[in-house]
Amino acid sequence: MKVETFSIGFGKPIVSWKWGEVKWQICFFLVGGYVKIAGMEREGDTKPQDIPQGFYSKTPWARIQVALAGPMVNLFFALIAFTTIWLLGGREKPFSHFTRLIGAMDPQSELYVNGVRPGDEITSYNKERFEGYKDLVYAAIINGRPTNIEGNKINYFKETKVPYDYLLTPYDSPLIKQGLKTIGILTPASYLIYGKQSGNQKGSIFRHSPISSSGIEPGDRLIWMDGELVFSVEQLTQILNSGKALLTIQRDKKTFLAKVPRLPIDDLQLTEEESTEIGDWQYEVGLQTKKTEIDFIPYMISTNLIVEKGVFFVDKDARMTHVASIPPTSQLDIPLQTGDRIIAVEGLPVSSARDFLKALQTKQTQMIVKRQGKINPILWEQEDIAFENETNWADLLPLTASIGLSNPLRQNGDFYLLNPVIPTRLKDFPFPQDMKDEMEGRVKKEMARVNKIANISVREAQIEEIKRYRNQLMLGAEFQDRPVIYNPNPFVLYGDVFREITRNLTALISGYFSPKYLGGPLFMVQVMKESWGIGIKEALFWIGAISLNLGVLNLLPIPVLDGGHICLSLIEKIRKKPLERKVINWLTIPFVILLIFAFIYLTYQDLARLLERFF
């Protein structure tokens, strides 16, 4: 066959030259390539079979061999790229990419109700070995049907594991983009290592952040906050915005921490006498806010901080609820009992009801960090074992037990209790003015979109969501994950990427996965640019992954693709006579149009994603 053009890459040629009768060119998208053979495109009224040395002038078997050559080069090139990565020692990736530990959960999910919490372990889903959070996303997307999930509930202090096994139905995720589903697990676990860019460096947006006065140092790992072990930034945000106060309680001769709802006083069902008494406390401590803006807890207490009774209150769904019926969302959600004595509010000792009322008006966060040397990368296969075993969790207990006492313990082993932090609402955070203007512009744009929604209930719900977003509390810290070395043998990596391709295709064909989440040509350019910025091994991975994608897609039985040419050649071999040119055109033209539309659609989605970053 006569080769007319040999192209390295796709798109517009960057450079081209003639060598003999063949045009050689290097194109803009340096992934894969193609060979243009005489006769593959129509030349006047000449039959394709009559073009000398043309593609259709050869036997079906010869054409199949030629059609296979391109995809096979792509597939082989991917293997070469993955082998090179393996020989270079693998890629450095975040701990969260491969961990089997849970980072954050939806408190309304069935899995959460069954007692699974952040920090617990997943071992399998649908009876298949669990390799990482991506497996759960695919399981929910592709199946959309009940998912079997197995794992272990971990008690880090007692070093025990209790197995669990549940069958759960995926539902729309409250955290991920609309159209994607979850079974209640929102993010994988990660390390929360306070980075240098979060410190008091000149020009840092975090320079005057709330956490800057806590005594935290670069390299510190946040372990515990307000009564809970912290396994992800998302969980940290949930704890920070839970609307609960951390109280130190004395019951009989024992002292313990408990989390109690902090509510607007107007939401509490109080008698006139009880309301008047709280008003007197407000006057005595000189709180200038309106009484309706005061926060309190759903308990009545005496002047010397003895719990007298629980009270009813209006919950977020406008239902009258008693404090005793609140479902627990934390191990510290312990209902207070008559006779309990409150001795501290969020670490601040109090001795009277008026002191308690004053302290309750200001949210303070208690945090414990693990102070250690540089954390070196480890192999991904050992990361969860290291997460569990490299920390002496029991050393936390003396620190947590002293919170709220007159002389709290500040250090025990590698653990340090930080100074209390008063978090700031997002809308009040001291961002640079240009960032503030950008954020306000986004909010106004989103409000304009929401105000056009015809459905009143949907519109009001989204307006409330925007308000919650602007009022969410934040520490003003940027945390880094622990790096791990991911270096499976090249055939395993090849198989992983191939399996991901087939899962995506299956989800697209079945309708469970929207094509708007796919990447187009601009996405590939963006990925390649970012990967080269990370390093040559990351760039090699994406070159190999894209090449493997192109090889697999090219083998699909679609006319105009190599897989389509193979199918047409097989049909000709079975029929023992060539197909008419008009039949080939009839089969090919619709798919050419479809591919053009797909290219335009994916490019549009790429542009939309890019513009989201700026507007």
Task: Specify the residue positions occupied by each region the protein language model found.
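Internal alpha-helical transmembrane segments
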Residues: 25, 33-104, 155, 159, ...
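Alpha-helical transmembrane signal-anchor/signal-peptide segments
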Residues: 1-4, 89-110, 613-615
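Small-residue-rich helix-interface/hinge motifs
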Residues: 1-50, 548, 553-575
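Interdomain regulatory linker/hinge segments that flank or connect interaction modules
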Residues: 44-84, 125-178, 225-294, 501
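Short, flexible surface segments
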Residues: 20, 31, 118-121, 218, ...
